[in-house]
Amino acid sequence: MTTSLTWHDVLADEKQQPYFVNTLNTVAAERQSGQTIYPPQKDVFNAFRYTELNNVKVVILGQDPYHGPGQAHGLAFSVRPGIATPPSLLNMYKELEGSLPGFVRPAHGYLESWAHQGVLLLNTVLTVRAGQAHSHASLGWETFTDKVISLINEHREGVVFLLWGAHAQKKGAIIDPKRHHVLKAPHPSPLSAHRGFFGCNHFVLTNEWLEKRGEKPIDWMPVLPMESE
């Protein structure tokens, strides 16, 4: 395990690759043509900004950014304060309520406090056109996030990967289960949560794993920045 490496160290070469340059150029061209793209440009890489490589303890894989106004801000499943909590995240809160004594469902869906504790909230595609789900799925983001997962697999040890749904599980096939702790369940979407996401106990199992390794468990109660100061 390499503890001092940063995202910049391991991704600098990847960001020079022609496919990645093309991805950024395509997104920029769409923005300049008047298309509304989510999240805003300044937020596209927030998952990496809030959770440095050497601090990654848990990875939660999402798929596409939210494509409604004001929702996406670069962290999978999370929405900005003041935005209604989306259905999948409500189901994550429901699972937390059912498995963690004392967990009280917050009135917001802002998960930055998870990210600061080492939970990488990574969408596998980092941008989307407003109102058009999966509209940027073929731009090259999947190649980039495959690389991110392989780098975590290589440079970290004992990371908990929470793989919810077929897309995340396929994406996580490269993870070495001897080096990391892989937990799988159906997606928390209302379409599939009742097929085994509810009752999966992943948040509790994650903390048990971290404590067994002598690491600080995650405080899964999301707090807004002003609440934690």
Curated annotation (Swiss-Prot):
Sorted alphabetically, the Gene Ontology cellular component annotations on this record are: cytoplasm
Q: Where is the signal peptide?
A: none
Q: What is its main location?
A: cytoplasm
Pfam families to which the protein is assigned, alphabetical: UDG
Entries under InterPro entries matching the protein: UDG_fam1, Ura-DNA_Glyclase_AS, Uracil-DNA_glycosylase-like, Uracil-DNA_glycosylase-like_sf
Report the active site residues. 64 (proton acceptor)
Q: Which cell locations does it reside in?
A: Cytoplasm
Q: Which PROSITE patterns match?
A: U_DNA_GLYCOSYLASE
Which terms does the record give in the GO molecular function aspect?
A: uracil DNA N-glycosylase activity
* Catalysis: reaction(s): Hydrolyzes single-stranded DNA or mismatched double-stranded DNA and polynucleotides, releasing free uracil
Report the EC code(s) recorded for this entry.
3.2.2.27
UniProt keyword list:
Cytoplasm, DNA damage, DNA repair, Hydrolase
Name the Gene Ontology biological process terms: base-excision repair, AP site formation via deaminated base removal
Please name the SUPFAM superfamilies in this protein's record. Uracil-DNA glycosylase-like
Q: Which domain of life is it from?
A: Bacteria
Q: Which family does it belong to?
A: Belongs to the uracil-DNA glycosylase (UDG) superfamily. UNG family.
Which PANTHER family does this UniProt record tie to the protein? URACIL-DNA GLYCOSYLASE
Task of the protein: Excises uracil residues from the DNA which can arise as a result of misincorporation of dUMP residues by DNA polymerase or due to deamination of cytosine.
Full protein name:
Uracil-DNA glycosylase
